[in-house]
């Protein structure tokens, strides 16, 4: 996995890991917010360096939410696989996100043993309190 270190550390509040797609507007907005606040963070573009099932399972576990809540319902593959028409368990959802990176919502921000889907980007504050 390739990490990109953001060079911001003036008033580092927390060490954060941001799982993102660099071309995503929300991901760009999150990076700008963190940089403006002087918060140090690392970045992983999981569309360039795909995550494996175990990495996704760990992320899901840290959110405390069901895996299917990380699905991007607007992606064509979501409809093609009929994911909105049936129940999908965590194991299947994780396997599908590993196989189809575009299915996973972004950005996901991790701090220690907790993670949030930063949509809207202000949700990152849940990890900073």
Model-derived features: positions:
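Local sequence-structure signature of Cys/Sec-based thiol-disulfide redox active-site neighborhoods
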Residues: 12-37, 41-46
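N-terminal amphipathic/basic-hydrophobic helices that include classical n-h-c signal peptides
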Residues: 1-12
